[in-house]
Amino acid sequence: MTATFIKTSRGKSPASLSSVGDYVQLLKPRIMCLVVFTAITGMLIAPGTIHPLIGLVSTVCVALGAGAAGAFNMWYDSDIDAIMDRTKGRPIPAGKICREQAWECGMVLATLSVFVMAIAVNYVSALLLAGSIFSYAVVYTMLLKRRTPQNIVIGGIAGAFPPVIGWASVSGTLSLESLSLFAIIFVWTPPHFWAIALLTLEEYKKANVPMLPVYCIRKTRSHILLYSIILAVVGATPGLFVKHPVLYEILATGLSATFIAYAIAVFREKGQPSHKACMGLFKYSIYYLFLLFAVVIACVH
């Protein structure tokens, strides 16, 4: 594996070894799905209308932009990906794609997505998309991830852009409504990632990545609970602009209360984190975001 990684890192692996599936994996498709859904939410709740074709173009641009950010992330982090068990099967450390190919893929997708968004949709959404790619690829991946245990807190800004981009695709503006969804994702991100980081902290130690659990497990548990409570408050803010606020608040409160219950289970543990508690929170946090945004869509119309 080490020899293969060194070979691919220097860009000497034959391009013929790369398949379509390898490039799809390079773009982090699971994250892309969540990004696309939150962007579509922004479109659906925005005032006004958008031509279906333009809406489709905007959605594809957001997906490609997210893929570009993922490619840049794997390009830059290929050294630590090769060390961690959770990531050593990714295309670059596995020898399926070389670093130069990943860089080129990221550049092509980033340029194409922003350019098409500017020409076909509007300049506001294009600038926001460019900002999102830059935030994840440069601010989080290159500047924060290896330098501070608060990396995922500040880096969460990148993942919070999509609903704002979706809103701007329709209206060409920013708004408190779209910023409300931005805030939800921003606050949701730390407990979501810290839950899985608690289970993989030894790998982060080995890779010398200063995730918060590496420094203090107890502090991480406290922060998870704190952010979960803040999320419940922020998650209630769409009730200020939806058409059916009472229904929204009832459903959002139920979802947030369950989130807090999972966070409490993690917080109450002593010693080493358990798979049951941490994975329970991690998996539910994904359902939470999908369901909460679905409730926003349902209660706006």
UniProtKB/Swiss-Prot annotation:
Membrane topology: Multi-pass membrane protein
GO cellular component, one term: plasma membrane
EC numbers, comma separated: 2.5.1.141
Predominant localisation class: membrane
Biological process according to GO: heme O biosynthetic process
Keyword Cell inner membrane on entry: yes
Localization per record: Cell inner membrane
MF terms (GO), sorted A to Z: protoheme IX farnesyltransferase activity
Segments crossing the lipid bilayer: 34-54, 55-75, 102-121, 125-144, 152-172, 181-201, 222-242, 247-267, 280-300
Keyword annotations of the record: Cell inner membrane, Cell membrane, Heme biosynthesis, Membrane, Transferase, Transmembrane, Transmembrane helix
Enzymatic reactions: heme b + (2E,6E)-farnesyl diphosphate + H2O = Fe(II)-heme o + diphosphate
Pathway: Porphyrin-containing compound metabolism; heme O biosynthesis; heme O from protoheme: step 1/1
EC primary class: transferase
InterPro entries membership: Protohaem_IX_farnesylTrfase (IPR006369), UbiA_prenyltransferase (IPR000537), UbiA_prenylTrfase_CS (IPR030470), UbiA_sf (IPR044878)
Pfam families: UbiA
Family affiliation: Belongs to the UbiA prenyltransferase family. Protoheme IX farnesyltransferase subfamily.
Other information: Carbon 2 of the heme B porphyrin ring is defined according to the Fischer nomenclature.
Name this polypeptide is given: Protoheme IX farnesyltransferase
Species of origin: Anaplasma marginale (strain Florida)
